[in-house]
């Protein structure tokens, strides 16, 4: 794999022509829209027609179906998904012509530097749900965030939105160390466990990656971590940066849940921060783990000055993300759920 010698930030200006290989992907489509909003001329390719492709074309983005070096035209740079390798005709063509090729994560990392607040949710489990919760909270606060989620959020009818506020919220994946291309001002670690062992050597290697991710946060920013998770505790151990912690019941944590009660499997509780009531939450998704997810989202809101009322309202309206224990209906009296369940 060739690594461009020119910083991708050099290209993020009006009039530059960017080609996105795999433009219909879940995190490439919002990337295309953000780049378009920055004044770049955006084009791309994908293997199949889709609603996403039609949506991009409706905004004036030229999308070719199928991959060919001819699709590059006179582009200035190429951005690709992790699934597209050097042997792809567009990537090979770009390399042959000396056109710089960047990874999707590099592009997002450069973009987030244009925002005052870059809130990155990481972890082995719960990223999509917690990023979705945070989106609801920041929307309730009328912060108008830009959002990138690795799943569909019913409120958005998509996995992303392009806002005009000073905050960007991203689901941040550790696979291939992609989140190390990011520039978080708020780095949230939900949990750390064994996963992606086709890339990482072992759990210690994964913890080291999360430690490096947290270490990216500037001194003005915040590292938020799950005090109840051993892997997360190991990941933030030894950081020079202070760590804001959340916990289900540990009252020595910065943020914890009080007076937890369950109704039909869904939790109701108070969010306590530094011993003071910050917000009351009534969840509409089941499971104790979602209390922790809500505490993580609330912690991110708190450190950025979002009022507790927005946490209450935002989570009151949250009924889950697509394919995350998503209730689809019933069949002969049995409840039917759709869950990604890829671990």
Description of each model-found segment:
Residues 9, 34-37, 57, 71, ...:
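Phosphate-binding loop of NTP-binding sites
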Residues 19, 67, 125-126, 196, ...:
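Histidine-centered active-site/metal-ligand motif
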Residues 45-46, 64-67, 103-109, 148-151, ...:
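Beta-strand->loop->alpha-helix junctions that form or flank phosphate-binding loops
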Residues 52, 73, 111, 155-156, ...:
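Generic structural signal for helix capping and beta-alpha/helix-loop junctions
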Residues 76-81, 116-121, 163-164, 254-268:
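Short, surface-exposed amphipathic charged segments that create phosphate/polyanion-binding patches used
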């Amino acid at each position: 794999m060739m690594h461009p010698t020119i910083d991708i930030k050099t290209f993020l200006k009006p009039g530059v022509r960017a080609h996105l290989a795999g433009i219909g992907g879940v995190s490439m489509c919002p990337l295309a829209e953000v780049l378009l909003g920055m004044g770049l001329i955006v084009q791309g390719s994908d293997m199949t027609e889709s609603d996403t492709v039609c949506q991009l074309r409706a905004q004036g983005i030229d999308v070719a179906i199928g991959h060919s070096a001819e699709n590059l035209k006179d582009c200035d740079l190429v951005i690709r998904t992790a699934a597209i390798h050097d042997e792809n005709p567009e990537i090979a063509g770009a390399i042959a012509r000396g056109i710089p090729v960047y990874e999707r994560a590099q592009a997002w990392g450069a973009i987030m530097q244009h925002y005052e607040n870059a809130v990155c949710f990481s972890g082995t489990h719960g990223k999509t749900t917690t990023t979705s919760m945070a989106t609801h909270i920041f929307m309730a606060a009328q912060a108008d965030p830009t959002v990138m989620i690795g799943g569909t959020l019913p409120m958005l009818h998509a996995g992303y939105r392009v806002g005009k506020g000073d905050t960007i919220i991203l689901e941040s994946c550790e696979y291939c160390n992609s989140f190390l291309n990011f520039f978080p001002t708020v780095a949230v670690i939900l949990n750390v466990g064994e996963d992606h062992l086709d890339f990482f050597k072992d759990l210690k290697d994964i913890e080291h990656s999360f430690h490096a991710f947290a270490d990216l946060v500037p001194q003005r920013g915040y590292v938020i971590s799950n005090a109840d998770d051993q892997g997360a505790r190991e990941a933030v151990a030894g950081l020079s940066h202070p760590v804001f912690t959340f916990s289900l019941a540990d009252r020595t944590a910065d943020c914890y849940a009080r007076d937890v009660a369950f109704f039909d499997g869904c939790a109701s509780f108070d969010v306590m921060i530094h011993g003071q009531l910050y917000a009351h939450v009534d969840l509409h998704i089941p499971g104790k783990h979602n209390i922790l997810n809500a505490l993580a989202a609330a912690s991110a809101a708190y450190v950025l000055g979002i009022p507790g009322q927005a946490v209450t309202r935002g989570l009151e309206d949250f009924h889950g993300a697509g394919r995350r224990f998503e209730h689809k209906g019933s069949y002969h009296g049995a409840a039917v759920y759709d869950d990604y369940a890829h671990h």
